[in-house]
């Protein structure tokens, strides 16, 4: 199955779709999973073990559908508390399966002091751009793939106040619904 969300986009609720994974096999799958799980695990060893077990099973599911793809497991832009659990899960997965095409990468935590926040403390546009460069550097370093420079979209010129204004527009539009 593919595409489920708890929210709507342009007034349309998405749903689960049968997906033929053989139609497209990516060279790289980036998994950025675990940010919200920290509110459940809260450092509890049993809950962290449960998270790790679920993560291992998720990697097995990804690999079953994408047998030749590299997998890069990331976390950190909104908090790094579960990163050790992710590295443990990846180590467990690799030991169990012998799969050497899975790597990990830890993002820097967003610099909200200088870059502000987007909605609900999510990374601002500037923080997203910083993360994109971090991820690009990691991919280049881990896989040796040549970088293609991004087109400068001027986002690095956005200030913290610009994002605050964006937040106000988003909050106003969501309260009108």
Where are these regions (language model features)?
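Surface-exposed acidic, glycine-flexible loop patches that form ligand/cofactor-binding
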Residues: 15-24, 60-65, 95, 142-145
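Structural recognition of the beta-strand scaffold that forms the well-ordered cores
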Residues: 27-32, 70-75, 103-106
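Ser/Thr/Gly/Pro-rich low-complexity, disordered linker/stalk segments of secreted
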Residues: 151-177
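Catalytic His-Asp segment of secreted/periplasmic serine-dependent ester chemistry enzymes
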Residues: 39, 77-154
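Conserved SGNH/GDSL esterase-like catalytic core that processes O-acyl groups on lipids
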Residues: 1-49, 77-84, 118, 122
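Extracytoplasmic, non-cytosolic globular domains
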Residues: 50-69, 75, 89
């Amino acid at each position: 199955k593919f595409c489920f969300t708890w929210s709507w986009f342009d007034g349309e609720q998405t749903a689960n779709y049968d997906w033929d994974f053989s139609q497209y096999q990516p060279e790289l799958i980036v998994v950025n999973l675990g940010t919200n799980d920290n509110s459940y695990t809260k450092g509890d060893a049993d809950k962290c073990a449960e998270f790790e077990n679920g993560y291992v099973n998720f990697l097995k599911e990804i690999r079953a559908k994408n047998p030749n793809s590299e997998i890069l497991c990331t976390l950190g832009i909104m908090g790094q508390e579960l990163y050790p659990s992710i590295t443990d899960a990846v180590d467990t997965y690799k030991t169990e399966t012998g799969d050497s095409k899975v790597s990990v990468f830890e993002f820097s935590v967003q610099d909200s002091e200088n870059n502000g926040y987007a909605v609900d403390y999510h990374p601002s546009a500037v923080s997203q751009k910083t993360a994109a460069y971090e991820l690009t550097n990691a991919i280049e370093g881990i896989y040796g793939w040549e970088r293609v420079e991004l087109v400068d979209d001027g986002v690095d010129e956005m200030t913290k106040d610009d994002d605050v204004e964006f937040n106000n527009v988003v909050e106003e539009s969501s309260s009108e619904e």
